[in-house]
């Protein structure tokens, strides 16, 4: 392995995001049972466009409720127009103004399965100071390098502030995240405060959460994995990429099925 240790690699990763002029990505979030089987109903596709100083667009797509041939994919987004931030969640059916971009990103963390926060915490200085970013991972160590989707990557492992295991695969050439994988242990029982928080955003997802937790009789272990398939920095982004249109069909839908 090269002479860089885990702390060096994470610092370089942070600087890459911090110093870039623009950033784009398209990703897929997958959830896996402890036996390695994907829970397909929890799959989420998303994309992020960012251009300094304040152009930001984040969109994500969840599977249809009911028959995929008849039902609509659930498309949600948040974006900026000058100093104002807006959001459109599938469950809300209308565009709403947000108090701030940072608050909008935090609000979307649960429904986007954590994807809205992962890279944004590095790109936005105002957000970086408010959240527990990956730089605060403890017991961080470098493992053997690995190939992910044909890309040569550093492979790191550590623990989050809640003691969950977390792994990172970081593209060597661009020093950008290629994959993040977090271990999650869920104990039986319904967290009523979490249920109410989800319900305030999306009643359907709150119902799904309650039904799932009511069916759980013992602690279960999951893995939440985010794969970054088209991440790039300092690239040209068209003005239309920062615009959300309620009636427009999301170009993430094909990615949802094939990535």
Residue ranges and their predicted role:
Residues 30, 64-65, 133-256:
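Gly/Pro-enriched, hydrophobic low-complexity segments
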Residues 52-53, 58, 104-113, 178-179, ...:
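Short, surface-exposed linear segments at secondary-structure transitions and domain or protein termini
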Residues 41-45, 71-77, 119, 209-226:
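Glycine-rich, flexible loop segments associated with nucleotide phosphate handling
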Residues 2-94, 141:
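N-terminal mature ectodomain segment of secretory-pathway/periplasmic proteins
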């Amino acid at each position: 392995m090269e002479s860089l240790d885990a702390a060096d690699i994470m610092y370089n990763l942070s600087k890459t995001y911090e110093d870039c002029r623009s950033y784009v990505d398209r990703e897929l979030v997958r959830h896996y049972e402890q036996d390695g089987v994907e829970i397909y109903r929890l799959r989420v596709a998303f994309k992020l466009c960012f251009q300094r100083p304040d152009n930001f667009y984040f969109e994500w797509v969840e599977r249809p409720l009911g028959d995929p041939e008849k039902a609509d994919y659930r498309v949600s987004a948040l974006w900026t127009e000058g100093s104002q931030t807006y959001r459109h969640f599938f469950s809300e059916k209308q565009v709403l103004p947000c108090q701030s971009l940072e608050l909008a990103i935090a609000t979307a963390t649960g429904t986007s399965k954590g994807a809205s926060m992962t890279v944004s915490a590095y790109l936005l200085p105002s957000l970086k100071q408010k959240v527990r970013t990956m730089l605060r991972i403890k017991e961080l160590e470098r493992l053997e390098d690995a190939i992910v989707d044909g890309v040569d990557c550093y492979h790191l492992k550590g623990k989050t502030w809640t003691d969950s295991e977390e792994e990172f695969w970081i593209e060597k050439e661009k020093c950008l995240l290629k994959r993040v994988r977090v271990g999650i242990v869920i104990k039986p029982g319904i967290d009523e405060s979490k249920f109410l928080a989800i319900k305030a955003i999306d009643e359907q997802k709150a119902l799904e959460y309650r039904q799932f937790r009511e069916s759980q009789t013992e602690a279960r272990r999951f893995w939440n994995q985010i794969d970054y398939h088209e991440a790039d920095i300092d690239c040209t982004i068209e003005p239309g990429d920062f615009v959300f249109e309620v009636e427009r069909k999301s170009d993430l839908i094909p990615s949802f099925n094939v990535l």
